[in-house]
Amino acid sequence: MNVLCVDIGTTSLKVGIISENGEVVSVLKKDFINKTSKFIAEKWLFTLKSVLVQIEKSLTHNLDICAISISGNGPTIVSSGGLTLLWNKNYKIQNVQTGNSLFLPKLIAFKELFEKEYSRSKYLFSGPEYFVYKLTENAITLLPENRYINAYWNDKILSEKEFGNLKEKLPPFVEIGQKCGELNSDIAKFLKLKEKIPVFCAGPDFIAALIGTNTLEVGKICDRSGSSEGINFCVNVQIFHSKIRTLPSVVPNLWNLSYLVPKSSKLSENVRLEKIGEGIEILKEIANKNNLIFPKRIHVTGGQSKDLEFLQKKSDFLNLEIAICNCNDAELVGDACVAFYGLKKFNSLKDAANSLVKEDLILKPKK
């Protein structure tokens, strides 16, 4: 049995076929092209179809898809009709108190920019949830863990008059691992898949990557890179630091400490290493102050996973072992973990990650 894993990027779709024993059957990335980003979400389904055709041509056996699992960037906002406000588009909004929410400022911006579409749209989604809606006709919002509620919204803040009827347009929360719906017949025919395949949502790509690197227990650490880079350290105490972003883990009672290097892809290798080194030292200091053991091994994901020469240089510089997993795109493995957990193949997300996340190569610092 395999899960069809889909991670929605800003300009491309990553698609993986991953088995219940963690085998990466196939991975493909394909750009979606549109003259404007305003309806870019409408390209996702056609891009997925194109990728599935390519994957089927490359395999000699049936895909045997038992579930579909979706993750993606955010907070991207999409209307029921596919009008899209990407996460990286910044607009000034009216002075509305949105607390610590990552989504409400974007939702307000959508309302102000696209007033007519806002009025006629039954729902407003984040990107992955819109794709779930497209596949199943079910409207949901994935809440990674109950403590994330302030990063989304709650009834109290939505009752403020400034938000008008926004509450009516936001689909209900579902838990990670909860079935979001089933593939409807028309979409199944279009994609040439079986009808009623269960569909799951792993939510934000950040969450999917933490699951897909198994950064789900105290002392685990991962380095996720793309246009920017982040070191993520799992701890069992809520810690605040001026240079660290603290967020809940998807595992209750655990927390994730993130040290971010914005636009790291534009930096030279040496400057990148210095920035990451600074982050590692800060996290080590935090670990020492809180009687936590700092790990000797760090899991990497993203584009850097393919650059063994740079990773060896990073291992030497940080004096840490670097683990490269059998899938360079951890989000896809995270998607698979969510689906197989939802299908009751595992008792917890952590059990799923323990089984599906596989180290392929370990680089050790040279003396």
Region locations from a protein language model:
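Generic structural marker for isolated residues within well-ordered, non-membrane alpha-helices
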Residues: 52, 107, 129, 154-155, ...
